[in-house]
């Protein structure tokens, strides 16, 4: 019996000049997603998908690597300028923004869209180390 051919979905190259880089930085991981201005995803990466495990995912270096990986894929689509939206309290926020600028994207705006509760859910108890 012949081996089945697995068809891979080929990436269609789009010509998109400007987009939005969404950086979601939690205490445990950093996710970088680059979209066009309408919100359609061009590229994404996270510290966990790059092979960082456990507490290494929450480091600024892991966030930097995630931003570089997403930027490389997005620049293949012709991306040049990007607005940055940052969400979350994690340690990889600034490192990811610096990495976007260092890889050749022009950052036009930085927006913090971290959700702030109007006294909603009770937060988790404080850590005692």
Curated annotation (Swiss-Prot):
Descriptive protein name: Small ribosomal subunit protein uS11
HAMAP family, A to Z: Ribosomal_uS11
Keywords noted in UniProt: Ribonucleoprotein, Ribosomal protein, RNA-binding, rRNA-binding
Subunit (UniProt): Part of the 30S ribosomal subunit. Interacts with proteins S7 and S18. Binds to IF-3.
SUPFAM superfamilies named among the record's database cross-references: Translational machinery components (SSF53137)
Role summary: Located on the platform of the 30S subunit, it bridges several disparate RNA helices of the 16S rRNA. Forms part of the Shine-Dalgarno cleft in the 70S ribosome.
Entry similarity comment: Belongs to the universal ribosomal protein uS11 family.
Alphabetical GO biological process terms: translation
Pfam families linked: Ribosomal_S11
An example Gene Ontology molecular-function term: structural constituent of ribosome
PANTHER family named in the record: 40S RIBOSOMAL PROTEIN S14/30S RIBOSOMAL PROTEIN S11 (PTHR11759)
Ranges in a coiled coil: none
Gene Ontology CC annotations of this record: ribonucleoprotein complex; ribosome
